Amino acid sequence: MAFASPPASPPDEDGQARAPRYPGEDTTPTSRQEIWGWYAYGIAAEVFAVCGVGSFLPLTLEQLARERGFLQSSHLPCVGPDSPSAPKESSPAMFRRDDTNEQCVVGLMGLEINTASFAMYTFSLAVLVQALTLISFSALADYENNRKTLLVTFGFIGSATSMLFVFIAPPVFVLGALLVVVGVVCLGSSFVVLNSFLPVLVASDPSIQNSNKESAAELHRLDPEAEYVHARTSFDGDEPTHRPPTGLGLGGATGTSSPELQLSTKISSKGVGLGYCAAVFVQILSILLLFTLSKTSISKASGTLPLRFVLLLVGIWWFSFTMVSRRWLRNRPGPPLESTSTGASSHQPRWRIWLHLVAFAWKSLWKTVKIALKLREVIVFLVAWFLLSDAMATVSGTAILFARTELKMSTTMVALLSITATLSGMAGAFLWPIVSRYFGLKSNHTIMVCIALFELIPLYGMLAYIPLFKKWGVIGLQQPWEIYPLAIVHGVVSGGLSSYCRSFFGLLIPPGMEAAFYALYAATDKGSSFIGPAIVGVLIDATGQVRSGFFFIAVLIVLPIPLVWMVDAEKGRKEGLKISEDVVRGGEGEDEEVEGLLAR
């Protein structure tokens, strides 16, 4: 497959690469083609994140289980000519609403599980496995040629899982759950590896070569109003303090005047924007594909077959743009695996060195936790982030299944719902900085406003339990059209929370420990996001209604508000600065533990 290269970047001013920091480092100046290779993977994988994980995978899992399931009350098939939900009209399945209100369950390991719960449990398991994988293997990306190899491998395997859904029929619906777990793990892992490219590309960019030569290795604090874009989201904290500035999170300048920060923010923001634009484009293509298939006999053969063709399209897209990244990205190798920093000897077999890296990653994370326990403001905010990230993940998954099973919305309507939320999220990322400046809000106050608006979503859904509204048949998410305004709220709020929480946490990090603490931040995010979906799944099984999960979600969303309010950013900055100064002075006693984390 051939791809046209973007315009070549102009040569750097002095025409010389910077000095290598370890044997074998590729210090070739970053080209525009390589930057576009980095963008290409975001364009590839973000489509699976939005169109797959965020839209069609939950629908496909639920529908696969539904076509294999039976009604709990009568034990009649949920789908088929003998089902109470058998269509009375000739409209295609993806445009048709299922008006039955009986609970559909499927037998699994001797249990009767609601088909919506099956999807929730699957994604809960997928996120848990993803978190364990990220913590265990993210350190491998920093050594030898593993960075590009892992990125391409995760991309190819992940895209294959999406394409393989075309072969998953209802009798083997459990295999669909397995593909989801593998796909989600590959998606999250590949984004971690992709982020690890960013500081390398920034460090070798010709535009900052001269500034790096002239700058001193000085610690700067983060501007409260700036968005911190960390250098990498690897879960290891093995960045030595004596290394020269290589970008964000590596001990270099992190203030708004830092050339590395400005360039990294520019590249990262453009990458996110391109990824979301690609996701919206493929989502529109998916709707057109569903519409086209509705004119054929395919839609009548199986309710999941059109969905599986959409996942095939998503997988092909992911694979194709991964090929672009494979061609345009340089290897950018890291230090040799036998580096003594991993605690492994060069005489050991390769697999033992890899095991040392896995153990090293977990020990590094644990050391970071012990350091964080000394910082009250960091701990309070991480607890708030633990709850908030779980709430965000739970709302996203619950909303799709609620639209499908409770509101009986068609596949096309749900796809439009996803597009609405995605476009609103893009708008929210630009809107909240303007709102914050206009009203003079501090970062934590902006987060609290976002959470308060987020709380409106489950509260509105709970209004349907009020007899008056229930009698009206409208208000409280009883009609399909009601969910679209809430999708706008969800998108706008999510865009603000994602950026402001990361930025606010950056204020509390001890200078020079950015990589380790953002690893802890990411671990908290992924480590919590499996709890909420699992609990909602249990509630659905107990009540037979997805709506019952709104009670739990409402409590989960509101809990972080007092915690965020309690965080004193100025006190947290002083605490972080004190620990950082102890490290710079060499540390004494317990502070040697901090230094060990950064200098191993």
From Swiss-Prot:
It is found in: Vacuole membrane. This is Autophagy-related protein 22-2. The chain crosses the membrane at residues 41-61, 117-137, 149-168, 186-206, 271-291, 304-324, 378-398, 414-434, 449-469, 484-506, 526-546, 549-569. InterPro entries: Atg22, Atg22-like, ATG22/LtaA_families, MFS_trans_sf. The gene is atg22-2. GO terms for cellular component: vacuolar membrane. It comes from the Eukaryota. Vacuolar effluxer which mediate the efflux of amino acids resulting from autophagic degradation. The release of autophagic amino acids allows the maintenance of protein synthesis and viability during nitrogen starvation. It is a multi-pass membrane protein. Glycans are attached at residue 444.
